[in-house]
């Protein structure tokens, strides 16, 4: 309360749990989750978010899943109307392809951010965007930079996860890939000592070095994690260290 200007609020539209409209995406907890990027759905998603959060504007709204079933022009028109109405300030794309960024821009859009998976272990999809993001002055916001925790420490890599835990199904649980990660941690350890940082902070700093308008989307549950993460903002990796990593 009374601190709205101290925060940047970002949420998403297009995937809805209303059991109606759009294309079937998945089912969970008795709900049918549909992907709908039509103007009426985008408007409802945003207005529902405003009501639930108790605010009169959102700083950033991300189209959660770009959908080719509905006209890009309709989606862009809805988002631009919401900007004019003052309900959102900016908007972006997620789960997309570089061609989608071009399509939104060519339809008269002003895409401020692209949110995609990107890490030192999985950099390829993200790198496809960088030239276009520079062209359109777009922020690249990465999630997954710590690979579900597997890049935080060698000890984390040895943990066992229940079959219902998403971390049990990612590639880095494979024994052969674990061995590769162990070698990476050995290479990175002297760099952590030199830069006085954790493994997590080092790979976050690496991500920031890849594009000059990079934003990190990092999950945190402890104050200590927040304190550790913000250190990456002050680290300037040398070119030879980036190459080494």
Where in the sequence are the language-model features?
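A short acidic, glycine/proline-enriched capping/turn motif at secondary-structure boundaries
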Residues: 14-18, 68
